[in-house]
Amino acid sequence: MSGVFLEAAAGAAGRPAGLPGRGGQPGLAGAEGGEGRAGPGAHGDGVRQGGGLQTGGAGAAARHRGAVAPTKLRCGGPEGCYYARVESLICALHGVSSLYVCRACENYHVCDGGDECIVVNTGDNMVCFLTGNCVADNIQDFCDLNIAVKKKEMECAPTDDYNTFLGIAEAIKKDIFTFFNREDGKLAEIREAILTEGGLRPEIGRLIEVTLRVSIHIFSKSDHGYDVICSMYVQIIISIYSTKTVYNGLLFKCTKNKRYDSVLKKMRELWMSTSATGGCAGAAAAD
């Protein structure tokens, strides 16, 4: 950013450039001019160039051109920099959400999954260690390197932490129960098929656990993975247990994304085969 732009921005907050300061001398064009103080020439501290003495705004401009801002050191110590997302009007205008700054040393970091990011695989997502920002969508090659190797395991088995898997399954069951337990005449047929007074029927809960094993990896693919999976279950249940169409604009948008079409198809096929065989298909998938 040029010095002229900076001086103009600073002068905009004070009086206009070119108005005289005290003592009849030209005022500074920048912040000093805004306060109405006399230019450096009035006090005899102008800048000499070519044997002459430049006063007022000319002296300030000469000093500005010759000044070099000292380099700021990054935060030391074991904790290092603490980054926060830059939230400004220009970032919002251009949709920039990957710019971070350390408030202490003013060091900037572009968190876009590039070489400066320290990427950590948390099991649920790919996260930059410096900012905590999820960068999985920006480092496709890196993700493929880690995910494609165990693609079959991720599609057919729960996460490494089985307790986490069960917790996710229970959360989905509660949300599915809440969704279909509403006072909606169009959902009455489905409520009778999948709900009891206190929750989902046991066989429905078991089907959710079995089919979740082929969709659990979506959590590492999308920032809204949980919502996508819940939407998948809503569509699967409606398509199987309803004899009439009850879709609306608020339901299930993930079929518009081809990446999830194959996952949805596998979930529905596994749901149907497990329901028909009494769990044999689910046991085979778990193996």
UniProtKB/Swiss-Prot annotation:
Pfam families: Herpes_UL92
Biased composition (Gly residues): 20-58
Record-given protein name: Gene 31 protein
Disordered: annotated segments: 13-58
Protein family according to the UniProt entry: Belongs to the herpesviridae UL92 family.
Source taxonomy: Viruses, Duplodnaviria, Heunggongvirae, Peploviricota, Herviviricetes
Classification via InterPro entries: Herpes_UL92 (IPR004289)
Organism the protein comes from: Equine herpesvirus 2 (strain 86/87)
Top-level lineage group: Viruses
